[in-house]
Amino acid sequence: MNVKRKRVIVGMSGGVDSSVAALLLKKQGYDVIGIFMKYYNFECPWREDSIDAMLVSQSLKIPFYIIDITKNYKNLIIDYLYKEYKKGYTPNPDIICNSKIKFKFFLEKSIFLKSDFIATGHYVRKKEINENGKISYKIISGIDSNKDQSYFLCKLNKVQIKKSIFPLGWLNKKEVREIANKYNLINANKKDSQGICFIGKIKFLNFLKKKLAEKKGIIIEINKNSHIFKYKQKKLFSKKIEYKKEYGKIIGHHIGAHYFTKGQRKGLKIGGYKYPLFVIEKDITKNILYVGMGKNHPGLYTKVICIKKYNIHWINKKKIKTKIEVECRIRYRQNFKKATLYKKNNDLYVEFEIPQLAVNGGQFIVWYINNEVIGSGLIS
């Protein structure tokens, strides 16, 4: 492959994926530069990871830099998390981090280092389309369905996609580790990172308690046969169910509704029931948790999602006269779910073929056609 020594910045996390991405690009003839981003000091093993990234860069004989973006990360991600949880939402920091932190700062650094491209170890594919001389780019799911990370890149803009290279999109995890072992990379067998790095070994509840104070409130059980479920989302554009105190019975107390998410069962600390209790809704203003018994409780499931026009992001915008058939994900590693997109007053409504479990406001829904990321939206 003749790439005429194009220069590429590779985001090095210290893990095996980004290390193999750098290795493959060097093998292809690119002028590779390794960059490690220090996000936060919150008991996160960033120092060990940075050393691994540095040692891999040394073994590949490529330049290596560490960028300290802790201030930006705090402002854009940490503060965002606290703010959203306080409002009762369940945010996804990884998606925001990719579009507003990682790819943004990689691009800025690429200008400074006169780099042609940026690259990461994400398991996604990028496809260039030439339509009558007009070039555009698509984000396609990685071939390893268990590792596909296209969900996390749903908020990238056109420039970020154009400038990006994803060397691992055509590989599965086993192949990546085999390559790492073949070339004796020190992190060939390093475990994948789990969860959000910045909270380190601290439990997420304790992380939230650092800024969000405990606030005692009541827990109300809603019976699965309650009248409020009889007409649940019968019409596509009908309003969301409004839970009220008088629709159920008080069965306990909690330490703060903002600590819980829909579908959660841990932390309720209420026994004596035949089946587990799950959070089906929360009223942040009144600090009330509504719960239901059993994983088949109708309050846990959602048939229709509304995406407000200001929360819609298109990668490959489709014209929607009335509706369009798509496949969706509302969380990472979820199998594709068949759905229909409807447009009304510039808002989008997503109607699932089968009701979905534990859909939370603040999360992202991503829609696909033939494995291509078409767009995404913040769930209202």
From Swiss-Prot:
GO biological process: tRNA wobble position uridine thiolation
Principal cellular location given in the protein's record: cytoplasm
Keyword check for Nucleotidyltransferase: no
UniProt name for this protein: tRNA-specific 2-thiouridylase MnmA
Pfam family of the protein (one): tRNA_Me_trans_M
Species: Karelsulcia muelleri (strain GWSS) (Sulcia muelleri)
Active site residues according to the UniProt entry: 97, 197
Annotated catalysed reactions: S-sulfanyl-L-cysteinyl-[protein] + uridine(34) in tRNA + AH2 + ATP = 2-thiouridine(34) in tRNA + L-cysteinyl-[protein] + A + AMP + diphosphate + H(+)
NCBIfam families, alphabetized: PRK00143.1, trmU
SS bonds (residue pairs): 97-197
SUPFAM superfamilies reported in the protein's UniProt record: Adenine nucleotide alpha hydrolases-like
Protein's job: Catalyzes the 2-thiolation of uridine at the wobble position (U34) of tRNA, leading to the formation of s(2)U34.
GO MF entries: ATP binding; tRNA binding; tRNA-uridine 2-sulfurtransferase activity
CDD domains, A to Z: MnmA_TRMU-like
Family: Belongs to the MnmA/TRMU family.
